[in-house]
Amino acid sequence: MGEYSSGFFMGDKPTNGRVLIVDDEADIRKVVRMALQKAGYDVLEAENGEKAIETINAGENRLLLDVVICDIRMPKINGVEAIAYFRSNYPRVPLIVLTGFPDTDMATSFLRQGVVDYLVKPVEGEKLREAVARAMEQRELARL
C-alpha cells in the first residue's frame, strides 16, 4: 500500500485518511483529534518525536500515514528532529507544523524544507481540517 492510506477501512468504517498528531500537550492532541475525527479522519497520537517515530514504524501503522501534524518544542526528540526524520524516511507524507510560536523566519525555513503548512496554536478546527485536506490534495497530485 506504500506510504498512503487514503480511502482505507478501519473495521467497517471507511475513513478520509490517517493523520499522526505529534504534540507533548495532551489537551492539544485531544482538540486536534476531535476536529479531525469530525471530518472522518483516523487519528494516531504521539507525545514527542521519539514516540512518533516508534508509532510510524510499528506494525500496521508502517507506511500507512497520509499526513503528520507536528509541534516543534517537545521533550526527547523535538519537532525539528522529527520532521527531519520524516522528510528523509517518508518524503511523500506531507508535514504540517502546529506550534505555539508565531515565528515568521521559522515558518519560512520549514516551508522551504517542504513542510506544507505552518499553523499557530490555538487553531480553529475548520482551519486545521482545511490544512489537512490541502496537504492530502497536494500529496495526491504529486502521485500523478
Please provide the spans of the model-predicted regions:
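C-terminal output helix
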Residues: 105, 123-132
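Charged docking surfaces used in two-component/phosphorelay signaling
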Residues: 30-38
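Acidic catalytic/metal-coordinating carboxylates
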Residues: 47-51, 78-81, 99-102
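Short amphipathic alpha-helix used as the core "switch/output" element in two-component signaling
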Residues: 54-57, 80-92, 109
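Non-catalytic signal-transmission and effector/linker regions of two-component phosphorelay proteins
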Residues: 1-20, 62, 129, 133-144
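The feature encodes the CheY-like receiver
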Residues: 29, 72-75, 99, 103, ...
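Acidic, metal-coordinating helix/loop segments flanking the phosphotransfer/catalytic sites
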Residues: 45-67
